[in-house]
Amino acid sequence: MRKRFGMPGTAALIVLAFALACTSISARPVYAADAPASSASPVLLLYDSLALSTPRAGNVETLERLFAAYGIEVAAMPVDRYAAGTLKSYKRVAVVRNAPDLSIAGSALASDLASYEGDYLQIGGQELPDRMRAKLGLKLAAAPLDSVRLDAGDYSQTLSAVEDLDYVAGASGDASRFGSLTFTSDGTRSPYALSADGYAYASYLAGGDLTELALAYAMKDWLHASGEFGTYMLIKEIYPFSDLELLKTLADRLYGAGVPFSVSVKPVFYNTDYPAMQRYLQALQYVQARNGSIVVDAPAVAATSTAGDGSLHGKMSGFVELLAANGIAPLGMGAGLFWTYDKVYASQGMSFFDSVFLEPNADGQHVQSTAASTAFVFSPFVMPFAQLQNFEQRGTALRTPLPLNLALSFDLFQDEAAMEDAIDTISRSWIPFADLKNGTHAVHTDRLTVQSSGGSLLIDGQPLDIGKHERAVDEDYAYTAAAKTSFAKLFGIQNQILMVIIGTSLAVFGLFLFIGYRRYKRKFLYPGGRHDSF
């Protein structure tokens, strides 16, 4: 047992047209990818441990999001809750071995796996079904505690001191190989993953490193997924009280750099007539006019119903319809993975969308948990752009096609300096970003349908003019309604009458003072008359 661890001028248009003509000859343009074509049968995902407080923590969730990126529903459970005969209900099974000291020998799972004839994927561990070992000709060995270099596609990364790593020491020549592991101490090199005849094995998976992408290459083959995949830019953490001027500047800079992008915006359910909300909508109109696509972010649990009273459906559809009424076409949703494992969130909050950007789970509260996830037609795997920066890129241009739809995410920047640094990094990355609008996406509410196809946006079948159409914001907006009054007109007339009476009385009183003063002077200051002549 091992120890555990602006509009261009005419000349500019001519130059641009010439450049585009040349580009069409020398390179294929980047289009938004359609949904991956793969069998939609669900996967049973079993794991022996969640590996909390270890480098492998989060790898089960990562695998769930990878399956979601291929439109596959997942039923996940720990190995110790497996019931005999469960495998018969699934054509695909994936097993994650995070704890080498937890053996499944003699268990109901081991017995069922011995006769299981469906597709099988295992990540880590040396306990394998005999069928898999024979099909792949697989020989495994325990790796020393050593740093290892992982190569996958156009990227590589050095993983430091990987504990409990089992590597492929030998395999059948018919098995497809994906990625490679090179041990620093002695230069030993082995495939990262293998796949053949419905069986696949990967040595290791950890959330937040290159193994996420490396495993996707093997999963694409194992799932028989086909189609073209794209890389998307996703800007997150956008609220009505974010720096909207910075958001507009970001849209201008990305538009000028020719980079299509999407923004994930927080929904607002109340006070949508406030000036702050009107500025929010204007900013989203501007972003859309600068070739940005709009995605509705999942609301915070506290902002929705946690009792399952059905209010979430009306709130989400109301926000979608508010956007559409203001000439904004939302094309999808962004949410944490746990939303797909909740009956209320999936049916009331996500059912409007066929495209969802699934992110790692953050703090959240379930309303009604489900054993299996809800899958979507288009669901890119979301990876922070900062994580990609940890990978070494071989060569300037990317040559190896991606194995899945990938969304590289940023939070809205704190200031313009951080934004400029990020845009400079994006420009130097040579990543061919795809435009979400070029794909086919649909959003349906009870009252309207929003669609995109081939770069066009449609609301109820009518093309949307995405040009700017800002409206003036009422700066004198009354945030509280005027109090209801009775007899206001009558009391208004009465006040006017009283003012006239008081004014007349003051005038008469002043006249009497003047007359009295004159009489006082004549009687007491000059008795007998004035004697001012000599």
Regions found by a protein language model. Give the residues of each.
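Short, charged N-terminal beta->alpha structural module
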Residues: 42-73
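A glycine-centered loop/beta-turn motif at secondary-structure junctions
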Residues: 41-43, 89-93, 118-119, 137-144, ...
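Cytoplasmic C-terminal tails of single-pass
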Residues: 522-534
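Active-site beta->alpha N-cap acidic-glycine motif
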Residues: 206-286, 300-302
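Short alpha-beta junction capping motif
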Residues: 47-48, 88-133
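C-terminal domain-boundary segment and adjacent tail
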Residues: 218-227, 232, 252-271, 355-368, ...
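Metal-dependent polysaccharide deacetylase catalytic core of the NodB/CE4 family, i.e.
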Residues: 42-49, 123-130, 134, 258-355, ...
